[in-house]
């Protein structure tokens, strides 16, 4: 398992917006995947200097889901929310 992706399940402790932002490294953007999962990524990763590394695992999750997104590669850390999970009430 990659240290660049955090997985949140129904059994995971509550995840707040602040915790999500701290993990991802800034403001987060939620991408809803076709398979029902959601992924949180750093909204401003592409304009940061230095640029965060490509997150191969998160990019693969998005690409395999069949979801079209405006970004080719996910940069930096990401959080994957299992289908039906919305943590922290935000």
Where are these regions (language model features)?
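Detector for the mature cores of small, proteolytically processed
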Residues: 1-90
């Amino acid at each position: 398992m990659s240290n660049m992706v955090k997985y949140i399940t129904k059994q995971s402790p509550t995840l707040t917006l602040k915790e999500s932002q701290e993990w991802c490294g800034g403001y987060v953007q939620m991408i809803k995947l076709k398979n029902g999962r959601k992924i949180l990524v750093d909204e401003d990763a592409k304009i940061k200097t230095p640029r965060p590394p490509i997150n191969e695992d998160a990019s693969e999750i998005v690409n395999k889901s069949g979801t079209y997104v405006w970004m080719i590669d996910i940069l930096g850390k990401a959080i994957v929310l299992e289908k039906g999970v919305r943590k922290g009430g935000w």
